[in-house]
Amino acid sequence: MVELVPTLLRQELARLAEDNLRLDGRGQWEGREVTLETDCLYNAEGSAKVVMGDTIVYAGVKFEIRTPWPDRPAQGSLMCGAELRPVAHRKYEPGPPSPQSIELGRVVDRGIRESGCIDMESLCIVPGEKVWGVMIDIHVLSDGGNIFDACGLAAIAALRTATVPAERFDVGEDYTLKVN
């Protein structure tokens, strides 16, 4: 017996492909509309909100002074975490971080590291003793697609607006984080 829903879905997808349309009505090569707002989180040292179609993402940057990793005594550190909560989409569940949220954080983290947009040595305060730890927190409020793109954009925009709070930690004057 043929299952009705998969057959109807397959027929609808075939019709959309023939008409060069996507499920949401956009053309085959048409992207989602993107808006970007920065400095939108009061308690973060840098922040951004990205709206990409129906996807809404916030990213915030915080700094802390840490002991450097033994194999990189003159380099700061970067940590990126992502939250996918049930409010974003019905497929997400409450509780500890899901494999999807862990992977999302890792992908954004790796993209920032591998791009070299932050000079990790510029985050050194005292070699072998003190470095800046950069923490990026990403919160997906609505997942309408393209969350990897939206999260990456939000993280980079938040970094570009971040001020290193050196005065608060008594290690100099505040300065804008340099992002290439």
Where are the language model's segments positioned?
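Polyanion-binding surfaces on beta-sheet-dominated domains and ring/shell assemblies
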Residues: 1-180
